[in-house]
């Protein structure tokens, strides 16, 4: 691995999966580092990208001959550009019966995961790679207590931490190009959106709702579109790894529960750019700082689990009286509640939601955690109070 590359935690999950399946599917957002991780993890395998028109044409014209070039397997990038190749890949791996033969990557889930799991059932191991985690960023630069706003404002796409562009690449410039190149091109192409202004408004309205309950009817009304269009557009944003819908945990413990999901963006830098936050200093006093911090903690939790190769079993819990647990993850027969507070000074009031949940859930409730924007970590009244600085390495 090049000394310029930030070591990705998911490489261990990737190596483990490659010993158990003939095909490894590495999926995630565009520009999250999938190609770099795949090539650095399997340096001896030939590399081809189906984004290249000539390569794609060769594979389309004669799929069997194309795959026959790689008797020891290959890294096939952007497989979503030619999903028909998966059927031919099935025949190759069935004949070879070797583990870790092909590595395929994909940036969009528009039916891609379904195609992969159906066509290559029992033959493919899945690894999801999101943007850089805090621990990965900290492996290359010192993180101190004053950098939270900068980290949230910058976001976690690897390009923004490239030492070759240090100081030259501004987050705003990068996100402007990212949205123009990928969001507008890819998403609009799939949806067939003709009214760009309305679609842009939809994305902005989604950004203003990050970490909030998703009322699809209200979102559609605010954008002047039908609820069915809003549902379709949102599903494509989710398939593009731009947003994630966090589902409510189903056990009610005798309470009436909210059934709506919560909407989260998967990168706070992109979220800040969409919300027109101009700098880390502006973020410090921004009205959306609390929701942005909650978004950041959720994505860190998700990255930690996915990087270990674990299922993304993260939920929230909220009853119709407003008692809410921001994050809830099951482990064995217990449920572990996490409260998220952006403040820097601890308040005992922050413990109330977890205490009420423990009362409702009884023995089902595991030890609670409160994650906050301060620098110290400690335990009080049976609850772990975790600084944002150490939270990502202890979740899940």
What are these regions (language model features)?
Residues 171-335:
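Accessory nucleic acid-recognition modules appended to NTPase machines
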Residues 26:
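Hydrophobic anchor at the beta1->P-loop junction of P-loop NTPases
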Residues 1-15:
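N-terminal pre-Walker A segment at the start of P-loop NTPase domains
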Residues 2, 107-109, 113-215, 241:
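Interdomain motor-coupling "hinge/lid" segment immediately C-terminal to the ATP-binding subdomain
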Residues 34:
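Conserved lysine of the Walker
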């Amino acid at each position: 691995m090049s000394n310029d590359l930030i070591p990705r935690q998911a490489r261990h999950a990737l190596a483990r999966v490659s010993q158990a399946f003939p095909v490894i599917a590495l999926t995630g957002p565009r520009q999250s580092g999938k190609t770099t991780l795949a090539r650095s993890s399997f340096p001896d395998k030939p590399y081809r990208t189906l984004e290249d028109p000539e390569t794609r044409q060769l594979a389309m014209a004669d799929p069997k001959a194309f795959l026959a070039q790689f008797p020891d397997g290959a890294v096939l990038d952007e497989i979503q550009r030619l999903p028909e190749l998966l059927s031919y890949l099935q025949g190759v791996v069935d004949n070879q019966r070797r583990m870790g033969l092909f590595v395929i990557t994909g940036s969009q889930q528009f039916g891609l995961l379904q195609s992969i799991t159906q066509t290559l059932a029992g033959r493919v191991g899945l690894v999801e790679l999101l943007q850089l985690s805090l621990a990965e960023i900290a492996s290359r630069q010192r993180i101190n207590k004053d950098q939270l706003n900068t980290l949230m404002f910058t976001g976690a796409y690897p390009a923004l931490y490239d030492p070759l562009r240090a100081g030259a690449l501004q987050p705003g410039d990068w996100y402007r190009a990212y949205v123009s190149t990928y969001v507008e091109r890819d998403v609009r192409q799939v949806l067939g959106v003709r009214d760009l202004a309305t679609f842009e408004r939809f994305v902005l309205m989604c950004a203003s709702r990050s970490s909030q309950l998703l009322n699809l009817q209200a979102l559609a009304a605010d954008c002047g579109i039908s609820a069915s269009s809003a549902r379709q557009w949102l599903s494509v944003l989710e398939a593009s790894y731009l947003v994630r819908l966090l589902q409510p945990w189903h056990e009610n413990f005798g309470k009436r529960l909210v059934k709506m999901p919560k909407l989260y963006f998967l990168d706070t830098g992109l979220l800040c750019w969409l919300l027109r936050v101009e700098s880390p200093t502006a973020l410090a006093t921004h009205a959306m700082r609390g929701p942005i911090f909650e978004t950041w903690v959720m994505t860190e939790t998700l990255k930690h689990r996915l990087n270990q190769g674990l299922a993304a079993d993260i939920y929230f819990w909220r009853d119709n009286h407003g008692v809410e647990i921001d994050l809830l993850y099951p482990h064995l027969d217990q449920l572990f509640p996490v409260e998220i507070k952006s403040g820097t000074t601890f308040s005992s009031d922050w413990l109330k939601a977890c205490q009420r949940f423990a009362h409702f859930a009884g023995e089902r409730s595991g030890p609670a955690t409160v994650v906050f924007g301060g620098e110290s970590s400690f335990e009080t009244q049976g609850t772990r109070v975790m600084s944002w600085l150490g939270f990502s390495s202890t979740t899940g």
